[in-house]
Swiss-Prot record:
Upper classification of the organism: Bacteria, Bacillati, Actinomycetota, Actinomycetes, Kitasatosporales
One Gene Ontology term from the biological process aspect of the record: catabolic process
Taxonomic source organism: Streptomyces sp. (strain D7)
Protein name stated in the entry: Protein VdcD
Induction conditions: By vanillate.
Keywords recorded for this protein, A-Z: Aromatic hydrocarbons catabolism, Detoxification
Further comment: It is not known, if phenolic acid decarboxylase forms a complex composed of VdcB, VdcC and VdcD. The term subunit is often used in reference to the operon, however there is no experimental evidence to prove the existence of the complex.
Amino acid sequence: MNHLPVECPRCAFEDISLLATSPVPGVWDVVQCGRCLYTWRTIEPARRTRRDAYPDSFKLTAEDIENAIEVPAVPPLLK
């Protein structure tokens, strides 16, 4: 699709990376925030893809992330 979101819906960070694209060209992209690692498909509803529609109770700030008590580790890949 080549049209990345300008900010993360969860933490408003502006570093968004493209992780994957639809096997059917132009249908959807999978993108990820560079700060909170929130990941979404570009065809998800607005409450998952737009900061102004994202639920307030799930929004994070840079301070929230820095002061998180525990960030779960990513488990090793299965072989």
